[in-house]
Amino acid sequence: MLAAEATVVPRETPRRRPWLTRSAVAWFAVAALGQLAFVYFIVAFYGTRTAGSDYAGWNDKPLIEGYVAGDSIGNLMFIAHVLLAAVITLGGLHQLIPAIRNRWPVSHRVVGRSFVLVAYFMAFSGLWLVWVRGTQLSPVSAIPTSVNALLLLWFVTAAWFLAMRGRHAQHRRWALRAFIVANGVWFFRIGIMAWVLINRGPVGMNATLSGPADITLSFGSFLVPLALLELYFVAQRSGAGHWRRAAVGGLLAGTAVTAIGVFGTIAFMWAPYL
């Protein structure tokens, strides 16, 4: 979420704000591991079934019905949305690594433009799947998905606009916001599993994702990371120690929850279907 922002002015020095940078890098390391596992699952589950023309096999994973007999357009839109989730996840990780951005700026620009195009498709296709095709568990669960999609359109547009005008520090901030909401599905899944493991069961959840915990996690999966990101920005700009301590504490707590969620999704949500 924040590792790339260490290069945004004002720069952090080892003596001034070591824990702020270290906590951001710690979160990014855990998140990158979880996102690579997510990409692997998409390729291993959906990619292999699609390559083998086993389209009905998309439904081997319960809850969402991806394949619907006779719905060629809907099926195509669904699998394009799912497979491009792997692309946008890898693209986001690529963009957040400062060494790549600094050493291969052309690659950063090309991947960045591709990220914007894929993000537009993901947002519009997600809205279409939810509200036109009806790929949802309940209207309640569709609302946060739609809010996330609209935020993605806003953030990637702002990031692209600022990049085109050479306002790089502002561009990176909006790009980080776009990274958060572009990974809303991933955040939601690790949030679910962290909640289940911490509470030793699906407290406040139901099969249609309309329980109180479901709704809270649906919105919180992107609003909480965005809030932590904004807190990090404030801590970077401010010389006040209380902002830095708050940001470090939030990031360390976020890292712990992310680690629990990553473990849960790999062990219980993805591995059983591979």
Predicted regions: what they are:
Residues 2-274:
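Alpha-helical membrane insertion/targeting regions
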